[in-house]
Amino acid sequence: HGDREHGFIGARLRMNRKVIAGYWQDEDVQKRLGGWMRAAVGAAFSRTLKVMRFGDNMRNVAVTEGDKVEVQAKLGWQVNTWPVGTLVEYIDAVAETETDALMKELSEKYEINTDKVDSIRYQAKTEIAMKRLLDQEGCRAFSNTFEDLYGMEQLPGLASQRLMEQGYGYGGEGDWKVSAMTAVIKAMGEGLDGGTSFMEDYTYDLTKGNE
């Protein structure tokens, strides 16, 4: 009787709810239930999601703008800005031993096709610094833009990709909405085949048959 009573309570209080009817061991019922549970994970994840903006969004671009107050009221996302200079301080504070350890990991995981190892090393330091700052502030998503790199030597390209691999959401050119959605979908899809990642639209391969 518990499920029916619980359903009645939701109906009586006019609460938004999902009703799934069927035998609990049937594959179609389990699939619908699993889909609902993943949506619930996304909703719960959203309520405590913090997004770190390194600087502002790209200038003269409207699509990356948004109402940060409204999105916190409706979805729970806390979207705030940290100075790029703060990130630079964290980068400068990364120990050489930490960088050496991450460079060893990168060399084992990737085929580094460049003699500009110092550039890769800087990306390693940036990854360590960004992760440290994100974790310190409890943020699971971040954004940045090439127009706001005060004191940084490079745009954190490899560092951003690596952080996405570790479950953080990311959006380019200050697009905090995309970074937050990427983090939410990553949480919803945990344990499934495939993955979720941010990709610039001009990198798509739309060749017929090879999309």
What name fits each language-model region?
Residues 1-211:
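An N-terminal assembly and electron-transfer interface module characteristic of large anaerobic redox
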